[in-house]
From Swiss-Prot:
Domain Radical SAM core: 93-312
GO cellular component terms listed in the entry, alphabetical order: cytoplasm
Major localization class: cytoplasm
Record's protein name: Lipoyl synthase
Cofactor names: [4Fe-4S] cluster
Binding of [4Fe-4S] cluster 1, residues: C81, C86, C92, S323
Localization in the cell: Cytoplasm
Assigned protein family: Belongs to the radical SAM superfamily. Lipoyl synthase family.
Pathway(s) this gene product operates in, as recorded in its UniProt entry: Protein modification; protein lipoylation via endogenous pathway; protein N(6)-(lipoyl)lysine from octanoyl-[acyl-carrier-protein]: step 2/2
Length: 373
């Protein structure tokens, strides 16, 4: 009988001290084994699960993906789609949409699920807001998502840079709706400073992902705090009741149904309007393994459960990600705007956008699987 392949699963947090490790140089990326090897987590072996048939994505033909990548490189911009190895990158890029990642490509955290590189970040690029705004205007985007790495090295966690980007986009593309997907701004006084700064120029949608159930935080999000994230969402909503708030969780990391439902209740109790629920996929063999693949029927049941709690929109499915069809999610939640447009094309209608989503979903079981964080 063939022995099952085994991988490691985090068990508990250990010391952050790594006396044998050389100091990190600013801007140097640590990825895969180098990144997880410095993580304050111990491991135990578990079998590797085979991907089920529903973990599939559509890979469109044509050169739209390369065209968009070229435009991003031309403007020295980064997308989380590329840095986090998102499985939906081909579909989104082929439609001319992307989630821009500001404040560099190096994160100060070492989350065991995430494929973004760890290290000591460089100082924020003061030209980035202008470059981002110019690209958004050139692409004719009507909806844009802006996210960032964690910047625990900055007193405001990067909040001022977010505001600079929002202001620049509104100057160059006043019709564009802006969703920001922020880090947790954890640290003494950092949340207060960040919220004060964001109050000067709030986004159209505020998104912060809790990522997983609280019991798994020590293994999945070392350095983060579940209640802190909930408080950030609630405080922002209290300051800006007219701005929709949003959060997301991944499944397959060892959580139970009861824990997921409790997390959804917590989010709603903290005045979160929209929620995304999707399957975690291991980006490399060095990251947290997948412990379970939730079925499409289970995702559908969670969508119904969430809507019954009072969320204005619940996107729940194996390939759902926080920024995937974010414009559609916001529209369903009542935020009025024209649909996102493709690179160099006229605006698509809401009906056409919905049809594209339906076609992609129907094609999912026939196409190649791409790993994701």
């Amino acid at each position: 009988m063939t022995q099952p392949i085994v991988r490691s699963i985090p068990l508990h947090v250990v010391s952050n001290d790594h006396p044998s490790s050389s100091p990190l140089q600013p801007g140097v990326k640590q990825s895969g084994e180098d990144k997880i090897g410095r993580s304050p987590v111990q491991f135990a072996d578990v079998p590797v699960l085979r991907k089920p048939s529903w973990i599939r994505v559509r890979i469109p033909s044509g050169n739209a993906v390369q065209s968009l990548k070229a435009k991003l490189r031309e403007n020295r911009l980064v997308t989380v789609c590329e840095e986090a190895a998102c499985p939906n990158i081909h579909e989104c890029f082929s439609h001319g949409t992307a989630t821009f990642m500001i404040l560099g490509e190096v994160c100060t955290r070492r989350c065991s699920f995430c494929d973004v590189a760890h290290g000591r970040p460089k100082p924020p690029d003061p030209e980035e807001p202008i470059s981002l705004a110019r690209t958004v205007a050139e692409m004719g985007l009507k909806y844009v998502v802006v996210t960032s790495v964690d910047r625990d090295d900055l007193r405001d966690g990067g909040a001022q840079h977010f505001v600079d980007c929002i202001a620049a986009i509104r100057q160059s593309a006043p019709q564009t709706r802006i969703e920001i997907l922020t880090p947790d701004f954890r640290g003494k006084g950092r949340m207060d400073r960040a919220l004060d700064i964001l109050a000067a120029c709030p986004p159209d949608v505020f998104n912060h992902n809790v990522e997983t159930v609280p019991a798994l935080y020590p293994n999945v999000r070392p350095g983060a705090d579940y209640q802190w994230s909930l408080t950030l969402l609630k405080r922002f909503k209290a300051q800006h009741p007219q701005v929709p708030t949003k959060s997301g969780i991944m499944l397959g990391l060892g959580e139970t149904l009861d824990q997921v439902q409790a997390t959804l209740r917590d989010l709603r109790a903290h005045d979160v309007d929209m929620v995304t629920v999707g399957q975690y996929l291991q980006p490399t063999s060095h990251h947290h393994p997948v412990l379970r693949y939730w079925t499409p029927d289970e995702y559908k049941a969670l969508e119904e459960y969430g809507m019954a709690l009072g969320f204005s929109h619940v996107a729940s499915g194996p390939m759902v990600r926080s920024s995937y069809h974010a414009d559609h999610q916001a529209k369903e939640a009542g935020l009025g705007f024209n649909a996102t447009v493709s690179l160099g094309s006229p605006a698509v209608s809401s009906t056409e956008h919905r049809e594209r989503h339906t076609i992609a979903s129907k094609s999912a079981s026939k196409t190649e699987s791409i790993p994701h964080r």
